[in-house]
């Protein structure tokens, strides 16, 4: 079906845009792949500015760096114009202080909840250690979801958290990642997934976690922080020059994105809060794991996988051996030792790599200085800057040139058994071709080493290799 062009206005609601489009595609969902970090960031910014009723946010990481701070201000501005904002953030890596969190939560249109708060918010060091010792499994069960829903009409999900390095704005280290924007018939299921977390006891309100700090928080402190936040966002020095230009042109770019939505069949996968919490061990899987296994088991010709971490969980070898024995080609691109941000996870992969290669899986290891950076962030060359190094962070899967998964699931035991995960499954050859082309490009020699022939640990110093060897001695595989 040809694209339907709808004229957009910054002052019209997202809901109006999508109503005008979706009536032409009953029962289908619009899909747009967000490959570039800058485009994904600016699309989020525009949608946040345009939302009129609700914004629901679910993240594993929300940093206090430049991007995280600007995003917080954007949500505050939305709340100030009457938008209801609900935020769920996993507790593990929160680095904001209680006053900052409570000052945002103090706005009547903003509610913040913390998922499984056993580590950071409202916990002292002794409490953290106690929970880690006495409740090891629950302390390791994290919400890895990354979803933003605007006016219950448009959603973005994928690999990106809210921090500089996920949007190509860290000056030294960035992630090669992938998101997808969806609209249409899949939205009720995405909203249902968010609501299941929002209503669950594992998601605890800030006012409950920080009751004492809230009592001590003054109106002046709240006002001082919100004023500072608005000043920060309005200061052009806090935006790179290229971002200021991009923001100016964003209305035109978003109009192009909306007209390029591809309408097709889309499903949404999400785990329940706590995942397999009823189990007593570190295994057992979840709904996302089971769905991906079922999709993979139907493969007949080819499976392409992109995952920053590659550690086979229990049963993984036999499963992929079965695929390969029936003639399915399996190719995976993951991080090299030179590019990885997680030495513990790499140590698990390092122990398994030869066995995976012996099975017949083609493995490619992403380079820290891939040629693809020129396509992803060409502004560095334009501005005469030195490009930062890259690590792979995209989590995608293409089966038989027809089925595509884009989401948060890493191919490791932690995603399979511990962390809650989400993602969309798209049954469409055009989208599959687009994502497969991107994955194959990441596998090219200018972007990745062939793990079967290239020198292992190429260009990596002794200390980093030693760290991997030491991590490999520990029995950590179930939680990697």
Protein language model annotation of sequence segments:
Residues 5-146, 150-480:
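Charged, low-complexity intrinsically disordered terminal segments
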Residues 1-2:
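Sec-dependent signal peptide recognition
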